[in-house]
């Protein structure tokens, strides 16, 4: 994690020790942080920087809460090492990160290895009511590995099928 001080961060950029990390391939583009689609993927970009500076993680939560009534739904088929998933989801993230959109205290992301040849996938199944949405957040924060609300897997590849065009967001390309 980089220090908040510009001087200290600059020093790391100039004098820091390089390290190897996994690089993902998304069609003809590469990325090393996250590839995502669905609800909230634009929240980090649409939330005003001043709000993020003042409220931190809470800024993401507040912006996301404004959108709960209009969650999208995607019927997808996903193949990955040792398995596949088919169902209706509202958010999917392919990650090589220990923190994304303020999620950093989850058991799953604490154990991410940035140089193991694997990416992590979080797929959030579409809730039908606010209680199900709350259960997603509770189980994710508890570190439950997978369940009725979401799926967390590590894999060397992910292959997606969907009947509609999906707008992916790549970060770290």
Language-model regions, residue ranges each:
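Catalytic core of DAGKc-family lipid kinases
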Residues: 2-94
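Short, solvent-exposed secondary-structure boundary motifs
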Residues: 11-16, 101, 149, 169-173
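Short acidic/glycine-rich loop or secondary-structure boundary segments that cap or lie
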Residues: 40-43, 86-88, 99-104, 129-132
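A generic structural signal for well-ordered coil/turn residues at beta-strand boundaries
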Residues: 20, 27, 72, 88, ...
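Gly/Ser/Thr-rich active-site loops/lids in small-molecule metabolic enzymes
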Residues: 51-58, 99-103, 107-128
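Phosphate-binding core of ATP-grasp and ATP-grasp-like enzymes
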Residues: 93-104, 141-144
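ATP/nucleoside-binding phosphotransfer catalytic cores, i.e., glycine-rich phosphate-binding loops
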Residues: 80-82, 86, 113-116, 123-173
């Amino acid at each position: 994690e980089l220090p908040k001080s510009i001087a200290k961060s600059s020093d790391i950029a100039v004098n820091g020790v390089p390290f190897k990390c996994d690089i993902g391939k998304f069609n003809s583009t590469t990325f090393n942080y996250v590839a995502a689609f669905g609800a909230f993927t634009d929240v980090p970009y649409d939330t005003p920087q001043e709000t993020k500076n003042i409220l931190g993680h809470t800024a993401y939560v507040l912006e996301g809460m404004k959108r709960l009534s209009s969650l999208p739904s995607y019927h997808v088929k996903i193949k990955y090492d040792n398995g596949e998933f088919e169902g209706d989801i509202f958010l999917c993230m392919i990650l090589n990160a220990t923190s994304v959109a303020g999620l950093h205290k989850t058991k799953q992301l604490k154990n991410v290895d940035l140089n193991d040849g694997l990416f992590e996938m979080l797929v959030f199944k579409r809730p039908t009511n606010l209680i199900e949405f709350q259960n997603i957040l509770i189980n994710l924060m508890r570190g439950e590995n997978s369940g009725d609300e979401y799926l967390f897997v590590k894999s060397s590849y992910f292959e997606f099928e969907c009947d509609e065009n999906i707008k992916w967001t790549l970060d770290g390309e």
